Structure formats: C-alpha cells, structure tokens
A protein has these predicted regions:
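Catalytic-core segments of hydrolase enzymes
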Residues: 1-90, 169-173, 247-259
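Hydrolase catalytic cores
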Residues: 32, 84-182
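Noncatalytic accessory or regulatory domains flanking protease catalytic cores in secreted, cell-surface
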Residues: 118, 123, 187-194, 265, ...
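Secreted peptidase-domain scaffold signal
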Residues: 146-148, 155-159, 176-177, 183, ...
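Extracellular Ser/Thr-rich, low-complexity/disordered mucin-like segments
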Residues: 352-368
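Single-pass type I membrane protein transmembrane segment
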Residues: 368-381
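Single-pass type I membrane-protein transmembrane alpha-helix
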Residues: 379-393
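Cytoplasmic C-terminal tails of single-pass
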Residues: 394-461
Length: 467
C-alpha cells in the first residue's frame, strides 16, 4: 500500500515505526509496514544517559525492544534509529476539566504517568521525531536554504520523497555502540547492520546552514536512468579552505519504485548501483552499504569515505544494473567539505522544474504529505500528518462542482425530452384532423363522437354553421 502510493506520488514520504518486537535480539522482527521498501523505517534508541536516568545509556544505544532486520528478502531494516525511550507525550482525558494540564505544573519523570502528561517508550515515539526532521528537510528545499545555507539563497524547490529520504539517511551517524538487552547485556553492532540500519538521525550532519552546521551539501533530484544507459557521473572536490570541519565524504542514492507482491523473495524491481572512485586512484572502488561488491537488494545505497583529504576529487557513478521498467528516477545526495556555495542551480534538478521560478513557492498541490505511522501489535497509528488541506478541499470542491454540473445537465435533458413530447402530441392530433377532401366525402355522414374535451371542442368548430 505505502510503496504503490509513494510510487504514484513521488513528493510523498511515509515515515513508519519499525515495531517493538526485538526483545532477545529477535532477527527479522520488523513487520509491515516497517518493512516496505519505499518508506523510511525508524527503530528506537535510548533518549538520554545514565547521568539523568538510571539504566539509560544514551542515543548511541539501540533500545532492547526495537525491532530488528533484515526483511524476508534480505534488505536493511530499520533504515534509521531515533530516541524512543521515555518520550514525553500528551495524555488528555476529554471528560475531565484541565485534562491536558499536569498536576501543579510538574513534568513526569521517565516511566512516570500523571494527569495530562505521561512518559512513553516505543518506536511509535521515534517515528514522529523523524517525521518532524523530514518536515524540516522539506522546508529547507522549499525555502531555498540549499544555495549558501541561508533562506532564499536558492530557488524554491519541491523535493521528491526520495530526496528527503536520502538526505536523512546520508547524514545518519554510524557511531552506534550497541544494543541494550537489559540486565547489563550489551550486543555489539556494526554499520549497516540490522539493529540500527544506516545509523542515528542527525540533522546537523545532513544539511548545511550557515553558521550552524559544518558540513557542505550537494544534491541532484529527479535524475533518471533508462534501461541500457551508461553510468551517469557526478564530480565533487574536497575543499576545507573555509573552515569546514567534516572529515568524511558521504554519498547516498535513493529511489522510489513500484510496489512488489506480498511475500516476495526478491522485492527490488529496478536495480541501480552506486560506487565512488578517487581521481588518480580509479582502480579502487568504494561500494555501498559496507560491502566490497555491488548491492542488488536495497533501493537505498550509501558510501562513506573516512578521512577524505583536502584537495582530493571524487567521481560518483550511478548505473542501471537491471531495470524491469523503461526507466527509473532517483535522488542523489553528498555531504562533505566542498567550499563555497553548497549547491548551484545548474547542479540541482527539481522534480517539478516548471514550478521552480525563483519568485514563488511550490504549488500546494505538489506538496508532500509526511505521515508517521506506528506499528504496535499489528495496528498502524498515524502519529503525524503534514498535509496541506487545500489539496483535499480542491478535490472535494471539484467533485461537488462535477456533481452540480451533472445535475444541471440532467435537468436540461429532462426539459428537452418534455419539449420534444409536446409537439409530437400536437402533430398527432393534427393528423387526426380530416383533410378537406375527406371532409367532403364525409359530408352528410353522421360523425362519430370522440371523447376528450379538447377533441369535441375542435369538432364543434369544424361543423358547418346552419343558415
């Protein structure tokens, strides 16, 4: 359901909870919809450290309950993790006065409940946080922050769901230290594994904001490869002359494709491949997702080059390995020290380029809907919905206008039928009126009386008057 909707509406991103079935290091416990290939699946980490709450290890540790991957066809899951333990939530009681007010203005501590507020744990708490981050990423493009890290420095763009997803995954931190399994048992993890996926969400490592973050940002949206095309290439050069403090080059490729049948053993339909080479060292390829070979399972691929040196140049390759359709669109994101502007108009393509004039914002009908869905016990809870109701209002208004139009057309048709019937009756009656010759033949013969007031009246007028 999510995959097909996102494929049909490529400015849409669904952010869903991975689930809470991971106790005991239970593998492949991420279930639908968290195992959908196009969504951004979110696992739960701890929220703060032991210094604040006893037993808490901090956001670099995955919560014991957070569902684990891989999916049944071997894809990475969850995609990312975010704080999901002891998150303060509303606990309104609609039948009680002041239901949303905590007692005496106090705030509940971890695991504590009180009037109006309560503390909750679960991937259902993590997903809304990531959905909020996704909303900020969308705003970053819509308000043109990507130009030089300030508002309105670039054209207003309507980003694809693939671009928003790639941006968040590209900045995710792989410094996950382990999984808390309770009773002091910590399971070690590795980058791109099935505990934390691509890592811990970090907006400061995902986007460049002047004076706030120290990472350069490049992106290409709405790119397309056709079956049989040679690889597309993109060039980046590491430039630390302006004080950039990023040590790594991170590149992420993401694409949204049509949904696969339930229970598929290989769900990837269109297989794109990402790899990076360093100029002068073309013999060495950096492959994605921690592998030494191409990835033929995931529709998100990430390459991280540790310690990218100042002045070194890299070529990013995106190629179509195997396509089941004629072509495939994709989004590509890179972060690192690039110097100067983070992006220029000639290196960024907007999915909806016809609406990318610098003087205005994106049309409301092309705004995305970001939904955070939580899967708890098989139920899907909508945690956050960013939707422009104008889209739905326009659809409702259009339907209402069409309904009125049909009703009007029906009335007009009924009137036409009524008008057609009226002259037909008169013509028939005129045919019943005897011709002059027939009247002459019938003269002197007794006239047969006809019923109907109108007919009798006409016959009386037709009889010859007596002298």
């Amino acid at each position: 359901m999510f995959d097909n909707y996102m494929f049909a509406n490529d400015d849409f991103l669904a952010v869903v909870a991975a689930g809470n079935e991971g106790l005991g290091d239970k593998a492949s416990s991420v279930t639908a919809p968290g195992n959908s290939k196009n969504v951004l699946s979110v696992g739960a980490s701890h929220s703060f450290g032991y210094d604040l709450v006893r037993g808490q290890l901090g956001p670099s540790y995955v919560a014991s309950f957070s569902s684990r991957g891989p999916t049944t066809d071997g894809r990475i899951a969850p995609d990312v993790v975010a704080p999901g333990k002891y998150i303060l939530s509303a606990a309104a009681r609609p039948n009680s006065p002041g239901a949303c007010d905590p007692l005496d203005g106090d705030v509940p501590q971890a695991g504590e409940n009180m009037e109006g507020l309560f503390s909750q744990a679960g991937s259902s708490m993590s997903a809304p946080l990531v959905a909020g981050a996704a909303a900020l990423v969308r705003q970053y493009f819509e308000q043109g922050w990507y130009g030089d890290g300030t508002k309105d420095s670039g054209s207003y763009l309507n980003p694809s769901g693939a671009l928003v997803k790639a941006t968040l995954i590209n900045g995710a931190q792989t410094d996950i230290r382990g999984v808390d399994n309770g009773s002091g048992r910590i399971t070690e993890v590795a980058a791109y594994d099935n505990n934390a996926g691509f890592g811990r969400v970090s907006l400061t490592d995902s986007l460049y904001v002047a004076g706030k973050t120290g990472v350069g940002f490049r992106f290409w949206d709405g790119e397309r490869l056709f079956d049989g095309d040679v690889a597309k290439t993109y060039e980046v050069t590491i430039d630390k002359s302006r004080g950039c403090d990023a040590n790594d080059l991170s590149v992420t490729l993401a694409w949204i494709e049509e949904g696969s049948p339930p229970g598929c053993t290989k769900c990837l339909l269109n297989d794109l491949d990402l790899y990076v080479t360093e100029r002068g060292k073309d013999s060495k390829r950096y492959h994605p997702n921690g592998r030494s070979i191409k990835d033929h399972s995931n529709n998100v691929e990430r390459v991280v080059i540790d310690g990218a040196e100042d002045g070194s140049s890299y070529t990013i390759y995106v190629e179509a390995y195997n396509l089941n359709s004629l072509s495939q669109k994709y989004a590509l994101v890179a972060t690192g020290c690039f110097g100067g502007r983070t992006n220029t108009l000639d290196t960024a393509q907007n999915v909806f380029s016809s609406q990318s004039d610098g003087g205005g914002g994106s049309d409301s009908t092309n705004r995305s809907i970001i939904i955070a869905c939580a899967s708890v016990g098989g139920a899907i809870v909508v945690c956050l919905c960013l939707a422009l109701f104008r889209r739905h209002q326009q659809k409702s208004k259009k339907k209402e206008m069409e309904k009125k139009k049909k009703a009007t057309q029906k009335k007009v048709a009924q009137k036409k039928v009524a008008r057609k019937k009226a002259p037909v009756t008169q013509n028939t009656k005129q045919k019943e009126k005897p011709h002059k010759k027939q009247k002459a033949k019938q003269k002197g013969k007794p006239h047969k009386k006809q019923t109907g007031g109108a007919t009798e009246s006409r016959l009386k007028r037709e009889r010859p008057r007596k002298c």
